[in-house]
Each structure stands twice: as structure tokens, then as C-alpha cells.
Amino acid sequence: MDTDLYDEFGNYIGPELDSDDEDDELGRESKELDELEDDDDDDDMGDHDEDHPGMEVVLHEDKKYYPTAEEVYGPEVETIVQEEDTQPLTEPIIKPVKTKKFSLMEQTLPVTVYEMDFLADLMDNSELIRNVTLCGHLHHGKTCFVDCLIEQTHPEIRKRYDQDLCYTDILFTEQERGVGIKSTPVTIVLPDTKGKSFLFNIIDTPGHVNFSDEVTAGLRISDGVVLFIDAAEGVMLNTERLIKHAVQERLAVTVCINKIDRLILELKLPPTDAYYKLRHIVDEVNGLISMYSTDENLVLSPLLGNVCFSSSQYSICFTLGSFAKIYADTYGDINYQEFAKRLWGDIYFNPKTRKFTKKAPTSSSQRSFVEFILEPLYKILAQVVGDVDTTLPRTLDELGIHLTKEELKLNIRPLLRLVCKKFFGEFTGFVDMCVQHIPSPKVGAKTKIEHTYTGGVDSDLGEAMSECDPDGPLMCHTTKMYSTDDGVQFHAFGRVLSGTIHAGQPVKVLGENYTLEDEEDSQICTVGRLWISVARYHIEVNRVPAGNWVLIEGVDQPIVKTATVTEPRGNEEAQIFRPLKFNTTSVIKIAVEPVNPSELPKMLDGLRKVNKSYPSLTTKVEESGEHVILGTGELYLDCVMHDLRKMYSEIDIKVADPVVTFCETVVETSSLKCFAETPNKKNKITMIAEPLEKGLAEDIENEVVQITWNRKKLGEFFQTKYDWDLLAARSIWAFGPDATGPNILVDDTLPSEVDKALLGSVKDSIVQGFQWGTREGPLCDELIRNVKFKILDAVIAQEPLHRGGGQIIPTARRVVYSAFLMATPRLMEPYYFVEVQAPADCVSAVYTVLARRRGHVTQDAPIPGSPLYTIKAFIPAIDSFGFETDLRTHTQGQAFSLSVFHHWQIVPGDPLDKSIVIRPLEPQPAPHLAREFMIKTRRRKGLSEDVSISKFFDDPMLLELAKQDVVLNYPM
């Protein structure tokens, strides 16, 4: 072999071979193959020749030793090559069937003391129905009270002696946390003192102030409230807020003073002091009602029957009437109704004359309430707690209570509960109170419709709803969305106000943005199944008539928060029910994103679901692309994030540090008239901005004044209450950024200077620009608040073509911004009202913790008849994160606090002062805070660090500023 023709690796490097040499090689190869194969394989041989690699280099990985799977099995067979160990050991080869379950539900209908058919029959008689919301402060015994009603009507459901039943805490998270998160409806049949049965639709609501949106949803579909107050703690933060909310919703108010056993067993008050304590609570509630209500007849008193007393833990519940009936049943020949009228107030019983007097017969005489109610109650509790073995059996015999030997051997708490249950019997006093003082759906319908329906009450539809007509056109108002056990679907919960809803019926669902002019927010759906909800089980029904509550399947897809369900045809004039108006504001903000970016669609679906589940939750996307959740507090957002991660998206989600929403405002009048020209130079608008009068923004938000009023009524309000001149008061164009927004646009032009007809033709466009501007302020894209914008001059083009919305709207927005920036702009931050309960020796520690967080105490007073103090304070929401934990650490867990949004307050410092240097990782002094908040908010939103005036000031306006020698702190 000639070595010159090959390199050291054996590759051929010689001259190209001629065709004769190639033919010789092919000939040799064909002879060898002919010896091995039959003549029939000649064609295959040709293919082999073509595929032969020849002399080129073949990489190891390209060498083919075996035929491919496709060649072996054919092109029709799919083959998958699986590398070894790609599946982690933590993941099973065959995954088990995954069942999600987040709530505790009964598998079958439990036994009740009434037939289900009887319950269904009562639904047809609206006069025998009561729709009631149970509300009250945190841990004042609402859920425990419902447990007593459930035990009374469900003989097989009994709570264990060592723990509460909590039948309406159906979510596992509620039971783990020991606090109600969702409002839970319960429909049961209860008898009154005379044995007459009524259908009670009760909704048990959370007591924590963070979840007051759940209470709002319950109040909307109720005709009255039962306000629960702890006898030992008295009126607390949320009690006062709920009284105000119920009065605003125009609902009947009754009170249940719960946990009266605490006065006896815990505080150990003498009977007379216990009476003073109870009377103080009633007086305090009446004082609050008179403060918020204009109805002078709305007075609470045990004598009127709208106050009852209870101890849910020991199955005690009575009104003066029901306690008097116990005496009547025991001694006979007593008119218990007349007797009940003498059991409250400064009334004494004279045993010699056997008469009641207003003057004490002797110095040692007790008031009738103490003598006939509290002293017997004290004796029963004292006998059970103190003398179980000696005198208790004899005492029980005198009361007609018979216990077995096994029952007498019970521990003190269960024994006391059993004795009280046998003595007081069923909760008929509570039923009497609700029946007498809370209107039936038929009686309360007119008030409910006037308050909640946006359409006319005088229309045929309005009249049908006012009469609660089951044969009228269908109108159903849904206020809550409840997810299924597995968190996949939602059922809409609401109240039928007119007509009858049937399973399988086609309906039209009207959303919150639906109007007769814009019907986009509506959808035709088919009702699935219908249920009556009883906390842990649902009773399926075929139809639900007017006046009842209903859980609806199949209509959840178009509903976001609340909705109006009506008939698809023949109800064209139907309008929506007013969206819920919450008594708190969502000011805490967190940004979320999935750990794995590819799971973003799952997170978005989860966000849509939590938005449905929580009434006041708001979700939005910032311009920077981050997804933001707004809630009322830390606990609220913690529950939202649990549901988002575990129930609805099942993915890992990253959460940013919590921040708060800000507002933008002004503290002076604009330093000069600000104007802006439209892009076509044919129109020019001039405005100034100035602060609103104190209290006016709150009046607008609380709908004390409404933009829908006629000009005369509107003018009178502003003239009398805020000293506006009549011309300005009657020239109000709009509130912004919506009908209840805390900003005002006023037309302050004169007919002699401005063509009012032309100005009127572009009014809608200017209002739209004003509302757009106030929705996103120039400082950091936050809401503008407390600002009055005055239109001083307007040059409007004659031709309609030159004054279209595309020209006017952005110009109006720009002039709003420029007028705002010329009026000494400031940032506003939300402030929380904090109520702390602590022993006297911990009060100083509370002051210390608050002072470190820019907080200040407004009131510090002892709770009457209790060893605790109540400290009331204000704290900036941005400094409130971790406050509760900090407080408990400093007081060894003895202090308990609740906080709720109260007001907006100006942040100290000028946000536009460029001389301030923000040092990273250092707390800023007070005058630097506004600047720090603005810069960090703008960074987070993806905006430039400083406000650029070139966006908001036209060239002619900048020239005018230069002439006026106005120094601006803004970059060009």
C-alpha cells in the first residue's frame, strides 16, 4: 500500500480516483454480495450502495448498528424512548386519584325534629319566614349560639363535652384558626313560646373586623339583625361599626347579650352589679343607635322584647317574657306577659302587699330583675358549681329537673350545661324576639327594594317585589359565591325577591355594570340544581318562591361579586340591585407571581376564583405587569393567599412585602391658572385646583350627598352645610373618579365670557377626562382625593368635528394634572383605628409599641365591671405590619388588638422636594417620608423616579410659567 496516499489517521488524501477505478470497486462489491444474497434482492442492493458511507469519517454517535423502531414495527406505531431515572422518587409511577376537600360536609341528610316537607311548605308562606343576620364582635358567641339552635333541631348532632361544635365553621381553615372566615347560612324551623313554628333563615357572620365584607353580604339579603354582645366585654370596636352598618342598611336591630355566665363565674360580680353592667350595655347601644339613626322609635329595651340574654356555652337563652313564662308554668295563674313588663328598670316587689312599686319598700330590697331573674340564675349556677353532692339533687327536685345517677357524675361544665338546658328549655325567647321585631319578607320587602333596587319602585316589577309576589316575574339578588368542596366550581347564594326560581330554568344574569343602555354585562344561563343551605348539608329542592334564600348551581360563570337573576324574556325593564357598599376599605396591597413562570395561567385562574370568593377583595394588574391583590388586613390576605395556593391554583406563589395604597391631594389653591390646548389647537380649557372642605369627601363617599340630586337640592346642601355660594353649588358637574368619588368638578365660567352652549356640548368629554385624571394621579398613579377642580375658562371650536372626545378627553385630563401640580400636591396614607384590650399593668407597653410605629393613643379607659383596660389609638397602615405580634411579645400575650381602616391623613414632607436624598436600608426621618413613599411606589409601578412636567404642561403653559417666574421641582 502506498503510504503517501493516506495520512497518519488512515484517511485518503491522494488524487481523485477516475471512473474506471470506481467501476472496479463496485464490480468487486457486487460479486461478493451476489454470493450472499439471492438475485431477487438486487434492488435492495442498489439502495445499500447509495447509503454506503464510503471513505468519509462517521462519528460514533452516528453509527447505526441496529434498525430503527420504525423500521422494525412500521410507521403506524408510536415509539417513546424513556431515559432512566427521569421520574423523581417522590413521585409515584402510577399516581393515585386525587380528591380535594376543603370543607366539612355531611354525607347524608341528618335527622331533624321536623319533616323536610314541613320546611318546604313553610317556604310558601312568606309571613312565617324570618331572614336574620347574626353579627357581633369577635368571640362574642355567635357560632356557639347557632350550635345550640342546631342541637335543638337535630337530635343526633351533639357537641363533645371538651370542645365546641362550631357547626357553621365548615372550612377546615376556620377550624384550625379558631375564627370565622366566611358567613354561613342556616335554614331551620323554630317554635316560639306558644308552639307556633317559623322558618328561620339565619346567616352566621365572622366577628373579625377584617371580614366585615361577609357581614355586608349577609345584611343585604336580611330583614333584621341580632347583634351579639359579650356581657363581660360590652360594646367593642366591631359592635359599634355593625350598629352603624345595620342602621345604614335600614334593618331592624335586636340585641342578644351573650355570655352572661361570665359575670357570675369569671368576674364574680354580685347580682346588683351584674344588673348595672347589663343596663350599661343596653344604654350604650341605644346611644350609638340614636347617633346614627334618625328613627326615634328605634329603641332597645328588654321591656320591649327586643333584647334577650343568653349563655351559649350553657344553653341559656331567655327574654323577660320567656323567663316570666317559666314562673307561670311553675306556679300557674300568672299573667306572664304583664309580669314580664315589671321585670326591668327601677321596679321593686313588695312581698307584704304582693305588688310592684317604683320605690324600694326597704333599704335591702332588690330590683325585680335582680330578685326574679338574676338571683335564681346565680343560685342554680352556684349549686351546680359548689354543692354537687350535697344539696344539688334536692334543689333540682324543687325545680322539677330530674337527672340520672350517670348524669349527676358528669364534670362541672357538662353538668351545668345539662341543668340549664333542662331548666330553660328551647330558645323560644329568641324566636319571640325575632318574630315580633324583625319583619317578615312580605312586610319588609318595600323598605328593602327602596334601599337596594336601582330601578323604579312604582313599575310593575317594583310592585311585584314590594309585595313579595311568588307568582310575579322572577327577580333574585345574589350577594355571595360559595365554592364547592373541591374548589372547582361556585354556587351563587341570594334571595328571591319576586317570582319563583325553578331548577333547570333559563335565566338572564345581570352583572354589576349592567344598565338598560349598555346590556353588555348580561348573559343567559340555565339554572342547575337548587338547594336550601343548612351549614354542613344542603337540602335539594325543585323550586324556591319569593322571600326565601337559595343556593343556585350553574349561574356562577358570569358573576364576579353580586348579580341580579331575572327571566330571559319579558322582563326588559329589569334593572340591577345596587352593588354591596362595604363599611371598610381595602388598603393593604401585596404583589404575587408564580415561582414557575409557566404556571401563570393557573395563578390567573386562581385569582379570578378568590376574587369571586371574597366580596371586598380587589385584584388588578399594574402597568409594570405585576399582579396585585388588595385586602382589608393581614389576616384577610393570609386567608386569601391560603385559598389561592391550596384551593384554587395549587401552585407555589411568591409574595412581595405588603404595602398600602396611597392617595394624592393638594393643600393650597393652584398658584396660577392652568390651561391646555387640544392637539388640533382649536380648543383650550383653563382650570385651577383647591382643597375640599373638611368632611365633604366623607359625605360624598357615604352618599349623604348624591350627584343624581336635582340642581336645587344639591345647591341647598352645599350652601347650608359648607357655605358655598349658590352659583357654585348649582354648577357642580360631577364627582370623581365615580359617582361617590371624593373630588368635585365645578363649572366656574361666566356666560359673558364663555359660550355655555358650546361648553355644554363637550361637558361629557370634560367630565370623562376629569374622572380619568382623578383615578390616576400624577404623583404615583394613585387616586386623587379631597380636591375641587374649577373650570375658569373654555375656548371651544364651533365645528363638532374639531371638538370630539378624542380631542377634549386627554386635554381635560392634562389640565387636571397641571392644575393639581400647581396647588402644592401632597401624598395621603391610610390610618388604622386600633382597639387594644389589656390588663392595667400592660398599658404602658402598649404606648411604647405604638410610639415606635408613628401611632398615638386617643383614649385609655377601664372596661366597666372588668379588670381590663381598652386603649384606642391610630396607627399608619404602612407601619401596622407585624404590630399585633409585636404587641403580644411586649405584653407576654396579655394584650389583644384589632385594627380597621379609619381615615386618610397627609404624609409629612413634600413628595416633590428633590433636595431630599433617600438613603437605602435606612429608616427615613418624618419630613422625608412623602418623598420616599412616592419614589418607591413609582419604582414598583415601573414609572420614572420623578414626575415629568413635559407630559402634563403644554409649551404655551411652560412659557407662561417662565413669565410668572414659577420655580418647579419637576424634571423636564
UniProtKB/Swiss-Prot annotation:
InterPro entries in alphabetical order: EFG_II, EFG_III/V, EFG_V-like, EFTu-like_2, EFTUD2_N, P-loop_NTPase, Ribosomal_Su5_D2-typ_SF, Ribsml_uS5_D2-typ_fold_subgr
GO cellular component, one term: cytosol
Listed GO MF terms: GTP binding; GTPase activity; U5 snRNA binding
Domain named tr-type G: residues: 127-409
Signal recorded as keyword: no
Top-level taxon of the source organism: Eukaryota
SUPFAM superfamilies listed in its UniProt record: EF-G C-terminal domain-like, P-loop containing nucleoside triphosphate hydrolases, Ribosomal protein S5 domain 2-like, Translation proteins
Binding site for GTP: 136-143, 204-208, 258-261
Sorted UniProt keywords: GTP-binding, mRNA processing, mRNA splicing, Nucleotide-binding, Nucleus, Spliceosome
Compartments, as annotated in UniProt: Nucleus
NCBIfam families: small_GTP
PANTHER family per the UniProt record, alphabetical: 116 KDA U5 SMALL NUCLEAR RIBONUCLEOPROTEIN COMPONENT, TRANSLATION ELONGATION FACTOR-RELATED
Quaternary organization: Component of the U5 snRNP and the U4/U6-U5 tri-snRNP complex, a building block of the spliceosome. Component of the pre-catalytic, catalytic and post-catalytic spliceosome complexes. Component of the minor spliceosome, which splices U12-type introns.
Protein known as: 116 kDa U5 small nuclear ribonucleoprotein component
Gene symbol of the encoding locus: EFTUD2
